């Protein structure tokens, strides 16, 4: 027998082994953590750069439970709401879930509610349970709880009903008493720049009194808000930002009595750094005994991005950032040594791209309102996301009021998004439309649109969408195919260049460059949509093969 001919049994075993190894490698690849191609804060040399999250995670609050750090942030009317992030070192973060699968009241949030909904939340861990307190400025302060940070989270309960009650944070005292600190939104309450402390019941789910006003910031600290409550060395501490989102400072109040009087100290401001308005966030300590502070910076169209600052205590006052001139007021750092942790951790980032190979949307995605099951379908057989054309609300003047926009945050200042779209319209209708959008107070999109004589690629812009202004739509080209790749490149200054490709190789720019704008209290977003203007007994649909950020 020729020496090159193997024993059939041996050959079958080899094939089986190769197949097994291939399956293992695919499984490992599928479980590989997300690492952004556009922004990674971990420099890989024991240092990090700010922002640690160059995306819109406004009003962050964080805690440590053992060796794990958990963070929440405002989500306003985006659903799912109250994103929960996890880290092992305060630098590398991943999204692990949302505390709100839908927003209550459900009917109210079935429509877009820009700027409303979930404002600055607080997360705490007490006696084996996670607590998240969050304010809705139109309804009051809510509480949701869970045994695990990944959920399931309890149905929110109303801790206190009222308008303009914002930014709550609890404190469990050593004597068993429970307190809640919060601020006021002038737009609803008719007053702002004040901080109030109230008693909670033992369960922490009901306010027990009218509270006491413990600090008035009108003279020295206008727009004081976002208070976070701590106790250390016999002092009650209220960490709170003041001076406005883009230009303010970080303030700390302290007192030996929970109701004051409170001493005041500015502990961080911009100084000579390029990080404007550094404030509102969370003090956390590490298992190794270090202190750190997470806060946001307002970057207009890019939203409120999250920074990590070193922190130390001097004479029972915190100093946040680096105090180079010794005045007791820190300034933010751009790069710094990473926190010391007990075990090394891998470089990870929140998910951005999506191949749509799962039966669930990636945790980076949010709708503009409470979603319906009829809006989308994830098909794991061919690895695609199908968006059905949903009729726009009769009252909608433009996409500002369209709930079924599927969006995610800008991941950094410069990036490119590309998606592959196959559009199958309902042939009984006209003006079904599906595509790629940059959303904010103004918006732009590149899309495929159905007309009587076929499919067209169109480019649409809408200035002052929040004011009800009309769109401007231009036909780019008549299509001879249902398949097209759509792209938007976001450059510095949030300048957005849309383009398309019919062969997947050559991309052709549309003639205009669009200036992205923030939304209501949020940064601009990028995402997908499929809509129609008429009601009928069935919908067309768009199949998105993938969504890639580079």
Predicted regions and their residues:
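Bacterial Sec-dependent N-terminal signal peptides
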Residues: 1-33
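Carbohydrate-active catalytic/glycan-binding domains of CAZyme proteins
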Residues: 31-550
């Amino acid at each position: 027998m020729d020496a090159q001919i193997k024993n059939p049994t041996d050959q079958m075993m080899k094939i089986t082994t190769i197949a097994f190894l291939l399956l293992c490698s695919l499984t490992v690849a599928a479980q590989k953590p997300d690492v952004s191609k556009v922004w990674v804060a971990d420099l890989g040399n024991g240092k990090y750069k700010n922002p640690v999250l160059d995306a819109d995670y406004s009003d962050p609050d964080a805690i440590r439970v053992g060796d794990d750090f958990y963070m929440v942030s405002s989500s306003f009317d985006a659903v799912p709401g109250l994103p929960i992030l996890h880290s092992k070192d305060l630098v590398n973060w991943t999204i692990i879930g949302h505390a709100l699968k839908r927003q209550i009241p459900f009917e109210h949030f079935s429509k877009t509610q820009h700027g409303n909904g979930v404002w600055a939340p607080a997360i705490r861990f007490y006696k084996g349970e996670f607590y998240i307190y969050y304010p809705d400025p139109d309804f009051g302060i809510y509480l949701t709880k869970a045994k695990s940070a990944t959920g399931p989270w309890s149905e929110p309960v109303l801790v206190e009903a009222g308008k303009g009650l914002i930014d709550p944070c609890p404190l469990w005292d050593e004597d068993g008493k429970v307190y809640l600190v919060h601020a006021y939104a002038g737009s609803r309450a008719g007053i702002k720049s004040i901080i109030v402390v109230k008693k909670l019941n033992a369960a922490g789910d009901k306010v027990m009194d009218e509270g006491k006003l413990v600090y008035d910031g009108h003279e020295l600290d206008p727009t004081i808000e976002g208070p976070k409550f701590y106790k250390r060395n016999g002092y009650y501490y209220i960490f709170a930002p003041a001076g406005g989102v883009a230009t303010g400072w970080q303030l700390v109040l302290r007192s030996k009595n929970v109701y004051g009087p409170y001493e005041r100290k500015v502990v961080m401001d911009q100084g000579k750094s390029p990080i404007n308005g550094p404030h509102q966030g969370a003090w956390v300590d590490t298992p190794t005994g270090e202190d750190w502070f997470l806060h946001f910076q307002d970057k207009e169209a890019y939203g409120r991005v999250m920074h990590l600052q070193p922190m130390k205590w001097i004479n029972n006052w915190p100093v946040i950032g680096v105090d180079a001139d010794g005045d007791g007021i820190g300034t933010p750092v751009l790069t710094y040594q990473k926190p010391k942790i007990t075990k090394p951790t891998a470089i990870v980032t929140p998910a951005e791209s999506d191949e749509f190979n799962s039966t669930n949307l990636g945790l980076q995605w949010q709708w503009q309102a409470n979603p319906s099951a009829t809006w989308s379908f994830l098909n794991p057989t061919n690895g695609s996301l199908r968006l059905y054309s949903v009729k726009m609300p009769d009252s909608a003047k433009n996409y500002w009021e369209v709930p079924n926009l599927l969006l995610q945050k800008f991941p950094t200042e410069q990036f490119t998004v590309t998606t592959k779209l196959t559009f199958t319209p309902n042939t009984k209708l006209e003006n079904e439309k599906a595509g790629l959008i940059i959303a904010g107070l103004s918006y732009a999109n590149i899309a495929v649109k159905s007309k009587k004589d076929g499919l067209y690629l169109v480019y649409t812009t809408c200035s002052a969408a929040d004011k009800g202004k009309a769109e401007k739509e231009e036909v780019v080209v008549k299509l001879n195919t249902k398949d097209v790749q759509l792209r938007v490149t976001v450059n510095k200054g949030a300048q957005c260049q849309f383009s398309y490709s019919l062969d997947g190789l050559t991309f052709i720019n549309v003639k205009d460059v669009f200036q992205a704008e923030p939304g209501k209290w949020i940064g601009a977003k990028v995402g997908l949509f499929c809509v129609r203007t008429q009601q009928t007994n069935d919908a067309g649909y768009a199949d998105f093969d993938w969504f890639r950020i580079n």
